[in-house]
Amino acid sequence: YGEARTAQDSVMLEKTFEEGMQVFPDSAFFLNNLINTYIYSNRNEKALEMLNVAIQKNPNDANLYNVMGRVYETGLKDYANAEKNFQIALEKDPNLTDALSNIGRIYYNQGVNKLSEANMINDSKKYQEELSMAKDLFKKALPYYKKAHEAEPEKMDNMIALRGIYYNLNMGPELEAIEAEMNK
């Protein structure tokens, strides 16, 4: 392992993790590192395959579902499956802050996209409909980001998202409060 790691030989490293899994099938070390190797090399289908193996071995590990959600979100751009896996992660651990902010980000980004679409519409009625859908998505993201922020009050990403949500939902006092927090 050390030799492969030092040489940064990803092929050898991957082979080492695969062999380690065969020799130590109950050890999460080799499986988790193999999953990370697949993720960082953008082999998302292989990462999902190994994540499913890991979940079979440890079905109550919320982090595995969270990682699976990230693979779906960032690697495959499959937001429905990303959301589903983030929800499962939160069912397993309602306080998993990464999953809270990840699912919040799914809704927030959808809201931003919907807002951009709305801004391209000239018809007032259609604009209002799209704007309403965008606001609903921001409202959906809000509780996840609030809970993540409560758990990790120093995390700037959560504060930036909350600022955007408060701004888009015309929540003046909350916007002022989060901006004051950000400027500490």
Model-derived regions: residue spans:
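Short coil/linker segments at helix-helix boundaries
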Residues: 109-144
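Canonical positions in the second alpha-helix
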Residues: 20, 53-54, 88-89, 148, ...
